């Protein structure tokens, strides 16, 4: 066995023309073995600039996928003033929403604004300073700005329903909520390995930690309740799905440029991040349902859905599934979100967001598969 580089070099000197397999090619140029690639990796990354290097010029693009995602994201731009919440106020104050449902919605809204604050701060503090390539930085900046819109939209909903300002820090009184925020914000990007793990966690933050709340709020849409709130959720889902797509691609590009960080321990840490995210969601779901169930959605269904969506996120990162939930346990989500207009649930299926030309359906939230 050729167990080390010295033995391999000695073998190749004795056997001219011998090559190990597989042989690596980049743009039809023969690089050689994995060891040969590692010897020239830094040179190759430096030649194209790399994710962590300032772009010398606007073009040529080295990460055109980031430009494409940014363009699509900006075409989906919206602001909180576009949302009509008048019917929500009538639902809330006119008896259409029960006391159990009010407590349920309030618990979700207590955390939602702060969750988007955490996500936005992560972009500004963890990622924008590190990723200096212009295409990627523009993508991250676009994502960060949209989180500000999410914050204002959910804050507007709180205020329109008459919830006091004290609700903005009420989440601190509940470990089920405070622990989620701690998880979302705790990262160490001081090393390449830590930066890679932080990118993976960002996919869990936006693609898992927010989605239980999305489902719990969007359920009211099915019964003609809180339709303005439902619109905010629909547009947020479109945004977060694009963010997850972009951050997953960034994670894989970063790992490709720094392959030495990707080992068994690195992958195991990501699986543990995913499992911990699910545990936190289970606790939060139990809190939301503490006063009882709501029409059309059981706590157990939300928990199963979170396992389903977590497996989809692992696939987007290029990893294997963990919970083995292959089918969406809430098929009504696809029906609700793939409609053409947001009018009355009983007359029309709910939304296809078309502001600035965005089209597409719920399945796009899961469409980015693994890379072998």
Please provide the spans of the model-predicted regions:
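Alpha-helical interaction elements in eukaryotic regulators
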Residues: 7, 33-36, 229, 266
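Non-heme di-metal
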Residues: 47-372
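Short amphipathic alpha-helical segments embedded in low-complexity Lys/Glu-rich regions
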Residues: 2-4, 25-27, 143-144
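Structural micro-motif
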Residues: 15-25, 34-35
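Non-catalytic, surface beta->alpha helical segment in thiol-disulfide oxidoreductase systems
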Residues: 26-46
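Thioredoxin-like thiol-disulfide oxidoreductase module
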Residues: 1-19
